[in-house]
């Protein structure tokens, strides 16, 4: 399986890293991570795979493998539980003091072989009681190193060595009786050591990078500088930078030319002032000479500029009317424009609305052009953009009414022409008859009805209609009568009164739909003809045919056809006719 390299980013203190223990990672998962992902080391592929080392090993394959002696591991028999307590109490604060490790330990300076040789030769000259010990020597050398690092931190560059008087301030904390006697001689030795090491610290320190070329091959240089690859600049960025530089050069050149032109202008002004002053001085001399010699001539030489002659105004041929006075709007004291110059909110909204409409129309046209010559056959096609579309086969129907043509001349009599009606004006002429078409509203004009004729199956002719309003749907009887029986429960004693329309045809339709077989009628009365008197009226017989207690049908008044019917008023209840007892017909004896 091919491995892929993963370039990991630099670690940062702001990035949270997951810490996993050994038991949290399975062996198979660890092997897959180590085999699939290879961390990019930043070196060449040949050096990374060590081809040269593999070639050397293959060449020396016949050589016998030499075993390297390694001491065998031995188990430690130390029992740390006996020396350390089991329960460890954590302190409230881990920081006990702010001193560094170097400040806590003893002197940081360690004697070298040269120091030991110098100290032996120095002590040979002194008595045994006045000799300098190795610890005091290290303490003095350490003070000199610390003071030099504080006073001259860049002594390795400028080769500056602090004086002996500056070093005495660091020797004050030490024992003056033992140290100050040897301070001068130790300072001279320390100064010679610094000069030999090119004024570098005598204590062993880490070697940092000072010069990139000389320190490149030095293996002891620590903390090398990280080489950051510069970002590759594309051609577009180069062109943009070049344009900016050209524009800047042009602007600077224009500014330079303006400054030069202004400088030349000021020089010309200075020359002109000098010439005018010289002319003034010469005229003053001429004036004095004229006064001294008594010359009385014109003073044209003393005048710098002659006044120009003005043309005489021409007489107007015709008196022109004065122009109308201009009406000026009063200026406001605060300097703001007048209300007529201010932009109205309605105008601003109208402009925004017009811009929005133009943008929408442009997008609609772009959408139409984009879908041109394409048919959307997907499961859920896009809805067509609202706009003018062609209705194939549909033609709008335009209603036109033809006026009645005038009577033909041939239909009249062929006799002599009769005088016109204008010759004999009528006293009360009839009002002119005005013809009005079908009322059309704006909606019908915007969407006129259209029709299409097509032939279907079995050569049947179909007429398709568009734009006609659908008829209003009547509510069902249950929905229409639902509100009629919604009575409040406050007045339970009163009988419910239902609102009925006396002119509604639903009741008549319901009664007309009842079959005759289901209606129970009383049997017709039996009339004994022998008891009928000879002069009985048919109306009396009709009245006697009803049983006692049965109501007589009341004749409903029929409205006159010439009169207009009253409008239905559903708010007024209609009282139901109550049955009235009729006298029973008695047989005639």
UniProtKB/Swiss-Prot annotation:
The protein's name in its UniProt record: Enhancer of polycomb-like protein 1
Principal cellular location given in the protein's record: nucleus
Gene from which the chain derives: epl-1
Region of interest called Disordered, as start-end residue ranges on this chain: 298-339, 403-430, 468-497, 516-589
Record's keyword terms, sorted: Cell cycle, DNA damage, DNA repair, Nucleus, Transcription, Transcription regulation
Entry annotated with the keyword Transcription: yes
Function: Component of the NuA4 histone acetyltransferase complex which is involved in transcriptional activation of selected genes principally by acetylation of nucleosomal histone H4 and H2A. The NuA4 complex is also involved in DNA repair. Involved in gene silencing by neighboring heterochromatin, blockage of the silencing spreading along the chromosome, and required for cell cycle progression through G2/M.
Entry's Gene Ontology BP terms: DNA repair; regulation of transcription by RNA polymerase II
Residue ranges, compositional bias (Basic and acidic residues): 474-487
GO cellular component: NuA4 histone acetyltransferase complex; nucleus; piccolo histone acetyltransferase complex
Nucleus found in the keyword field: yes
Assembly mode: Component of the NuA4 histone acetyltransferase complex.
Feature: compositional bias, Low complexity: 557-566
Compositionally biased tracts (Pro residues): 567-589
Subcellular location(s) of the protein: Nucleus
InterPro entries: Enhancer_polycomb (IPR024943), Enhancer_polycomb-like_N (IPR019542)
Source organism superkingdom: Eukaryota
Similarity comment text for this entry: Belongs to the enhancer of polycomb family.
